[in-house]
Amino acid sequence: MLIRADGAGGTKEFTKWLTGRRVAYSVGFTLPMDTPDFYHLVPEWVWVPALNSDGEAREGADLADFTGLLDLDGWPAGMRVIVRRERPHPGAQLRFDDVDGYRLTAFATNTTLGTLQQLELRHRRRARCEDRIRIAKDTGLANLPLHGFDQNRIWCQIVALASELQAWSAMLALAGH
């Protein structure tokens, strides 16, 4: 079983809990403030291209394993931290924590098999779940429009059904995409 989570799941307590249950995980990881120092220690040849969902190299996005550079005291043994660097898209707002023009994001995993590219692609696929949540909110889950609890409970079921219909129709109609 694999548990995937965004940055909210990247805590010592949660990863220890998952490790104690012998569950594989891939969770967002908050990089420390001194990340630029670590970034500059990584030679250019260490970075490998990130992949698109179709398995092709994504231009301008690279991956490196920062596990040996970070202080991971208190984190579960065997945890790896994989960093993705990517140039922000044209027009994107730059952030204070961008390093040398790259936006750095990271995730932690206890999976030992697979390339950095495979692990990062697997982690990024959690975005489908986040997309389904966004669709559910757009479909009507963002607000409960009725006054009674039972009425809103029925409303939530209707929204869930509509979200399922949207997901299935997209999978069936756009199977090759």
Label each region the model flagged:
Residues 165-177:
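A short, flexible helix-boundary coil/loop motif
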Residues 119-167:
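Short amphipathic alpha-helical "interface-anchor" segments enriched in bulky aromatics
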